[in-house]
């Protein structure tokens, strides 16, 4: 059984499909639209994690949590367009910031943004499940509810004592957070 919010989608789908055909739009535009979505959302079908961009309030909250002295490493799992990383890097010169993004277009935007800001960020295109979390002092995740339990298992196995796992918005099932901001 489907969730109730699918009902309006089913009701409007056919009329919209017929209206679109009546507009006689070139199929090239549909290809461009599809490829754009593919570049933006990448492997969402596999990861179950769409593109979420961190807000300014998250930037402000993270600035209070990160160490003010002593070098530290920070990784953003699913770093999107790199806004969070560049903002944090501009405030915390003592940090080395890493971003891992699986969608091609946000990763490219992040790399270009990083080149323009000349910050201490290192952006990688790939799957964060393939990275070793023991290399980082702070692991930040703004993913979705789907991978949180697996993320916790990976973090528990790989992260060093004293390192910090920060989850934005989505709870880890069965785990009480040490602190909520």
How would you label these PLM feature ranges?
Residues 10-49:
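Transmembrane alpha-helices and immediately adjacent membrane-cytoplasm interface residues
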Residues 44-158, 164:
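Membrane-proximal soluble helical/coiled-coil segments
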Residues 162-171:
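Conserved beta-strand signature within the Rossmann-like core of class I S-adenosyl-L-methionine
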């Amino acid at each position: 059984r489907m969730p109730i919010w699918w009902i309006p989608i089913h009701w409007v789908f056919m009329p919209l499909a017929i209206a679109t055909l009546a507009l006689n739009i070139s199929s090239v535009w549909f290809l461009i639209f599809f490829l754009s979505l593919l570049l933006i959302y990448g492997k969402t079908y596999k990861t179950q994690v769409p593109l979420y961009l961190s807000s300014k309030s998250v930037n402000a909250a993270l600035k209070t949590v990160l160490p003010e002295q002593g070098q530290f490493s920070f990784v953003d799992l699913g770093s999107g367009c790199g806004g969070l990383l560049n903002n944090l890097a501009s405030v915390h010169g003592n940090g080395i910031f890493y971003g891992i993004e699986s969608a091609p277009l946000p990763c490219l935007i992040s790399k270009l943004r990083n080149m323009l800001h000349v910050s201490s960020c290192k952006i990688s295109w790939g799957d964060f499940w393939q990275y070793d979390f023991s290399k980082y002092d702070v692991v930040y995740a703004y993913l979705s509810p789907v991978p949180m339990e697996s993320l916790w298992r990976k973090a528990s196995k790989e992260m060093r004592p004293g390192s910090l796992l920060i989850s934005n918005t989505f709870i880890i099932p069965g785990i009480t957070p040490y602190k909520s901001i």
